Every structure is written in C-alpha cells, then in structure tokens.
Amino acid sequence: MKLTCVMIVAVLFLTAWTFVTADDPRDGPDTAVGWRKLFSEARDEMKNREASKLNERGCIEDKKYCGILPFANSGVCCSYLCIFVCVPKAP
C-alpha cells in the first residue's frame, strides 16, 4: 500500500515537472529565464549539431582496440566498422 502511494506521488510529481519545464514556443529565447533558458539552449544545441560539444571528440584509428561488442557503424572508429579492433574500409 505504501509503495503504491509512493509510486503514484512520484508519477504525479514527474508529470507536473514535465509541464513546468516545458518550453512555450510563443516565448523567444531572449525572454527565457532560469531553467527555461537552460532548456532552450540545450534544445538549440540539438537543432544545430555543429554547436554540440560532442562532435569535437575524435575517432579511433584503424587496427586499434574499439570495444568488446562488435557493432557495425558504431561511430567510434574512423572507418565506422568495429569488430574488436577498427577495421579499415575495403578499397
């Protein structure tokens, strides 16, 4: 019973938090204050991928260890093919 009440309160809190932090498209980024300004800047960074700091990371060179699980097109290797080591692209 207590766990159910806690879960209901948590869901209501998270729902309210979603509505409070939602960005109003009628407001421009210059009128945003506090948390709204922070969320607006984060959303603008996702729209403009060149502004993202995640794009600044480098890639792993060919024949270097890239991970345990083999995933094709993982983006970790410069050649985009990782099978325990970065595999160079076929000519």
UniProtKB/Swiss-Prot annotation:
Residues 23-57 form a propeptide. Its main location: secreted. GO terms for cellular component: extracellular region. Pfam families: Conotoxin (PF02950). Disulfide bonds join 59-78, 66-82, 77-86. It comes from the Eukaryota. Expressed by the venom duct. SUPFAM superfamilies: omega toxin-like. It is found in: Secreted. The keyword Membrane does not apply. Keywords: Disulfide bond, Knottin, Neurotoxin, Secreted, Signal, Toxin. InterPro entries: Conotoxin. One of its GO terms (molecular function) is ion channel inhibitor activity. The keyword Chloroplast does not apply. Residues 1-22 form the signal peptide. The presence of a 'disulfide through disulfide knot' structurally defines this protein as a knottin. The cysteine framework is VI/VII (C-C-CC-C-C). Belongs to the conotoxin O1 superfamily. This is Conotoxin VnMKLT1-021. It comes from Conus ventricosus.
